[in-house]
Amino acid sequence: MQIERDNRFKHIIYIDMDNVLVDFQSGLDKVPQEIKAQYEDDGTGKQHYDDIPGIFSLMEPMPGAVDAVKALAAHKRYNLYILSTAPWGNPGAWADKLEWVKKYFDSDNNDGIFYKKLILTHHKNLCIQRRTWLIDDRKAHGSQHFEHHLVQFGTEKFPDWDSVIDFFIGGLPSSVERTARNQAWATHFLESLDDDSEKPE
């Protein structure tokens, strides 16, 4: 099919959910304090708010996120997917994330931007291939391996969705810069294959 052939030449943009598409704090603000207190410290000094049942269903989009995604989706150069992680201790969050995508991106039918294009994994690096980018706020769960193809949301370079749109639509690196970066990525990838420390025993 022509559509399938065209997709082969598109850049894939993976987009994280928490604090990239989704405003985590907006959901947390709606949770009663007595419930939040149960997830604030389990003896490790860490908060586990993402384990609160139903919290993801309460969250709102990050400012500008919905319009920005629609702009990227309308650009013929890109093919969009959501690449996110869901908490292992909160099974309901996996379903809540799907429902959130359906709600805000009309993805309950095959005309939706993210219809059957939601990937939930703790190993985002498994999705690395040619012409792939990741918009993520953290270098965790394999996102750090995207290296120069990681657009780290919330940083000085990419503080908001306007800056992300400017990069992908107005300021994507030139063909010369992309060639150099692709060569660097390929070299790093081949070196990792030769590194015995990264191989399973």
Regions found by a protein language model. Give the residues of each.
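Active-site neighborhood of HAD-like aspartate-dependent phosphohydrolases
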Residues: 2-56, 159
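Short helix-terminating capping/connector loops at secondary-structure junctions
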Residues: 6-9, 77, 110-114
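Substrate-recognition element of Asp-dependent hydrolases with the DxDx(T/V) motif
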Residues: 60, 65-95, 101
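N-terminal pre-catalytic "stem/leader" segment of glycosyltransferase-like enzymes
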Residues: 32, 75-81, 85, 192-201
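Short, flexible loop segments at the rims of nucleotide/cofactor-binding pockets, characterized by
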Residues: 56-60, 111-113
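Flexible, charged surface loops at secondary-structure boundaries
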Residues: 5-9, 74, 125-130
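C-terminal cap/substrate-recognition subdomain and adjoining C-terminal extension
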Residues: 88-201
